């Protein structure tokens, strides 16, 4: 899992049926000290995070399991909104 901050939303006029009803967010990975770093990721959002919020994201098989669709074509999912972090 990784920490990140939601930078925006992604809208798609056409997408895989597996993604129907799935909100997509643009998330910037952060290190544990709260410094941005890494490439922006498009993440499926299963918890209703908003722009500017700090989040936990997971990738790969864990992301697909998190949204309850093991065959869904996603690589990353937001699984928590961060209230605080001590490092």
Cite the ranges covered by each PLM segment.
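N-terminal first-folded block
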Residues: 1-32, 37
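Short alpha-helix capping/helix-loop boundary micro-motifs
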Residues: 39-44
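Fold-independent oxyanion-binding glycine-rich loops
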Residues: 7-9, 14, 29-30, 45-46, ...
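C-terminal structural segments of small proteins and small subunits
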Residues: 56-87
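A short, acidic/glycine-rich surface segment
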Residues: 14, 38, 63-67
């Amino acid at each position: 899992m990784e920490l990140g901050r939601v930078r925006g939303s992604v809208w798609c006029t056409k997408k895989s049926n597996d993604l129907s009803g799935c909100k997509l967010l643009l998330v910037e990975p952060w290190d544990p000290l709260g410094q941005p770093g890494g490439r922006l990721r498009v993440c499926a959002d299963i918890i209703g995070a908003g722009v500017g919020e700090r989040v936990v994201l997971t990738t790969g098989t864990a992301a697909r399991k998190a949204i309850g669709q093991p065959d869904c074509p996603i690589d990353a999912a937001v699984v928590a909104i961060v209230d605080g972090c001590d490092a």
